[in-house]
């Protein structure tokens, strides 16, 4: 694109047009030059002409080096010309306000934005505008985006306000960034407010951003109103627009209404793509109409759209969730026969379902065939299998596949290790569990809270609370905050070991940390007290439990009744049992069981 401006003198000729960025982005060649209406007067001294040329070259080089390849700064030449009052042609002033000062300021702002100095950039922008400089919208848009990413939409909105009042003209990209920031922050009303006041026409991206936010918030009716406004402003929906609305309609109003929207989409000349069809297939499956979804899948090619692996995965998952795993296996075989390349997700859907159903042999067959079809199993492929072996107490097979997994270059994740640790602890192999836990960090897998809780609980149940407490200290050192499960395990273990006073100490530490004890924790303390023939303290603890807002359960009362009987107060125990039954606090069947043990 040839951007030339006719001027009456060379110093007025240097001009950058506001549309520079858009033309550059479109790939048009820009020729920014000046065209003079006549030759430069011979009366102008050669030195002055050279200085004038240097001003132009300097400005041009600053523009070039500043990277103004986007929506460029508008430079104007407001020179006062040459003064010839004395007839000697001296250069009186070149008040160049295609503004080197603006260029320098914008360069500095741009540099701040590039280095992530958002707050400093904001202050500099305010100072720029205060001194009359016109900001370039490219770094300002980047500033808006940066603050939006930090959730500081108010600061971002202030930048947009500064831009609008400075003489700069924000374009649709700037507004889209601001609207997107509001939508991501859940401030949809503010986004709509920006849409209403935009000084340029919104584009399809603007509307799609707002429609996505409204639909995700369950505001389908309002989204349809925005669609109407979009059409009124001659902004035509694209496939993304309709797919957003079809997905929301499937969720909120059902597939029947979504199909009407699909028809409208076609009537407007907008062709659905595979993503649109996948949304509909998913909606049909969620309504429990699997056979209809399969028919829809088979009809897609005749509608001009080939299903992809995601389409098949949706159907496959629905087949598995409804127990039709044999159909799922047939669908996988059909995919392979037709030349579709299944993804690792495809295989994992089937493996996961078969393992949950205890069909480990079939799951192994599928896992072993994956490499033949260009898919390497990942940790999500092995984890269900390991869990299945652990559930069936086949620890040898679980360890075998764990080793096979590693030998094939697939490294276990924390879910893998948690599965193995849980199984080892349940099997009483807590020392093995501790050994694995100690090796996790060296294997590049950081333990999480559930990892520690699993081993702490295993140690506590195995009567090794000393080691469990050491693990508690270790997890605290790693900034992992203990929870109710952590303390309940320790309190229970200490109580069972007869260390009830130490258990009570941990209980109060528990409370000081703001962790709310549950009935299991209270019951553990009461059981420890009753076993140490301190039923009176156990009764006090029951009262304390009620005062703390924790409702006793049948186990709480059973512990106390058995504690009274254990201390030779069978009569009092029976009286309490009858009273609890009469008040409906214990079932008659439970009371009879307790009475039978006395």
Swiss-Prot record:
SUPFAM superfamilies noted in UniProt: HCP-like
Keyword field contains tRNA-binding: no
Spans through the membrane: none
PROSITE patterns hit by this protein: PPR
Record-linked Pfam families: PPR_1, PPR_2
Domain of life: Eukaryota
Keywords: Repeat
PPR repeats mapped onto the chain: 101-135, 136-170, 171-201, 203-237, 238-272, 273-307, 308-342, 343-377, 378-412, 413-447, 448-482, 483-517, 518-552, 553-587
Entry's family note: Belongs to the PPR family. P subfamily.
Protein name: Pentatricopeptide repeat-containing protein At1g09900
Phylogenetic placement of the source organism: Eukaryota, Viridiplantae, Streptophyta, Embryophyta, Tracheophyta
């Amino acid at each position: 694109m040839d951007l030339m401006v006719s001027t009456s003198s060379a110093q007025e000729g240097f001009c950058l047009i506001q549309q520079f960025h858009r033309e550059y982005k479109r790939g048009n060649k820009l020729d920014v030059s000046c065209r003079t209406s006549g030759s430069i007067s011979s009366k102008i001294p050669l030195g002055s002409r050279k200085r004038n040329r240097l001003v132009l070259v300097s400005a041009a080089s600053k523009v070039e080096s500043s990277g103004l390849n986007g929506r460029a700064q508008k430079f104007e030449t407001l020179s006062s010309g040459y003064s010839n009052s004395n007839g000697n042609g001296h250069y009186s002033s070149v008040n160049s306000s295609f503004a080197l000062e603006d260029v320098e300021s914008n360069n500095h702002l741009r540099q701040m934005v590039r280095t992530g100095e958002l707050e400093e950039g904001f202050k500099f922008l305010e100072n720029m505008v205060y001194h009359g400089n016109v900001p370039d919208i490219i770094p300002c848009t980047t500033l808006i985006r940066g603050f939006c990413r930090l959730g500081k939409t108010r600061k971002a909105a202030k930048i947009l306000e500064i831009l609008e009042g400075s003489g700069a003209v924000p374009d649709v990209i700037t507004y889209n960034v601001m609207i997107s920031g509001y939508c991501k922050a859940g401030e949809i009303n503010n986004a709509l407010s920006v849409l209403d006041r935009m000084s340029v026409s919104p584009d399809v991206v603007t509307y799609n951003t707002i429609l996505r936010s409204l639909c995700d918030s369950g505001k389908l009716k309002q989204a349809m109103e925005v669609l109407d406004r979009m059409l009124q402003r001659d902004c035509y929906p694209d496939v993304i627009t309709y797919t957003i609305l079809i997905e929301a309609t499937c969720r909120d109003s059902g597939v029947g209404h979504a199909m009407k929207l699909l028809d409208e989409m076609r009537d407007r000349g907008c062709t659905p793509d595979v993503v649109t069809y996948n949304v509909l297939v998913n909606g049909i499956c969620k309504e429990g109409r699997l056979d209809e979804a399969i028919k829809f899948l088979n009809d897609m090619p005749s509608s001009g759209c080939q299903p992809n692996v995601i389409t098949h995965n949706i159907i496959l998952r629905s087949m598995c969730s409804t127990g039709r795993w044999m159909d799922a296996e047939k669908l996988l075989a059909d995919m392979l026969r037709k030349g579709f390349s299944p993804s690792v997700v495809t295989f994992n859907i089937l493996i996961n379902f078969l393992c949950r159903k205890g069909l480990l042999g079939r799951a192994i067959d599928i896992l072993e065939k994956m490499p033949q079809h260009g898919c390497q199993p990942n940790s999500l492929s092995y984890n269900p299998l390991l869990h299945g072996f652990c559930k069936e107490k086949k620890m040898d097979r679980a360890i075998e596949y764990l080793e096979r997994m590693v030998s094939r270059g697939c490294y276990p994740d924390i879910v893998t290790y948690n599965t193995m640790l849980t199984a080892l602890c349940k099997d009483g192999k807590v020392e093995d569990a501790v050994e694995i836990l100690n090796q996790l960090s060296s294997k590049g897998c950081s333990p999480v809270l559930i990892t520690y809780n699993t081993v702490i609980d295993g140690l506590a149940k195995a009567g090794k609370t000393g080691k469990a407490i050491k693990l508690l200290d270790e997890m605290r050192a790693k900034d992992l905050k203990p929870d109710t499960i952590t303390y309940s395990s320790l309190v229970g273990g200490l109580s069972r070991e007869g260390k009830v006073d130490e258990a009570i100490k941990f209980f109060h530490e528990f409370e000081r940390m703001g962790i709310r004890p549950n009935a299991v924790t209270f019951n553990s303390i009461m059981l420890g007290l009753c076993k140490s023939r301190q039923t009176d303290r156990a009764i006090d603890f029951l009262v304390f439990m009620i005062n703390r807002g924790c409702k006793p359960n049948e186990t709480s009362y059973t512990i106390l009744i058995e504690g009274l009987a254990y201390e030779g107060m069978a009569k009092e125990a029976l009286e309490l049992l009858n009273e609890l039954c009469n008040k409906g606090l214990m079932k008659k069947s439970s009371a009879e069981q307790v009475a039978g043990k006395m």
